[in-house]
Amino acid sequence: MQVILLEKVINLGSLGDIVRVKDGYARNFLIPTKRARRATQSAIAEFEVKRAELEKVAAEKLAAAQAEGEKLNGLTVQITQKSGVDGRLFGSVTNADIAEALAGQGFKLEKAQVRMPSGPLKVVGDHPVSVALHTDVVVDVTVAVLGEHV
């Protein structure tokens, strides 16, 4: 199925690109989340009329994400978990825990925006974590996991 992208989609294209994707991907993800539209002649003509407005909205989202990223970049978040004597945690610190800790500091994030390349944190210490605020704005945050000896 051919679709017109209404915003930048990772590994697919940017605003205004007409791309071919599998029917299920378009029907179940891109179209319901308003990231794309079916590429019919009328939709293409309508898109060209609204193109400037959509580009302006995309630029505003990017500017807002960059402003939020400047505040968030280099921030250290402290999370306390129960741990054993050897420094290993009972349980782990997940992206949901980090998003919740950042929400406590006034940042509005979803857990999917917190990227943890090595998986959940299972030891006490400082760990680098990436936060994707926008497809073009990814900032680094340090998570300090503090052990609470039991």
Curated annotation (Swiss-Prot):
InterPro entries: Ribosomal_bL9 (IPR000244), Ribosomal_bL9/RNase_H1_N (IPR009027), Ribosomal_bL9_bac/chp (IPR020594), Ribosomal_bL9_C (IPR020069), Ribosomal_bL9_C_sf (IPR036791), Ribosomal_bL9_N (IPR020070), Ribosomal_bL9_N_sf (IPR036935). Transmembrane segments: none annotated. Keywords: Ribonucleoprotein, Ribosomal protein, RNA-binding, rRNA-binding. PROSITE patterns: RIBOSOMAL_L9 (PS00651). NCBIfam families: L9. Binds to the 23S rRNA. This is Large ribosomal subunit protein bL9.
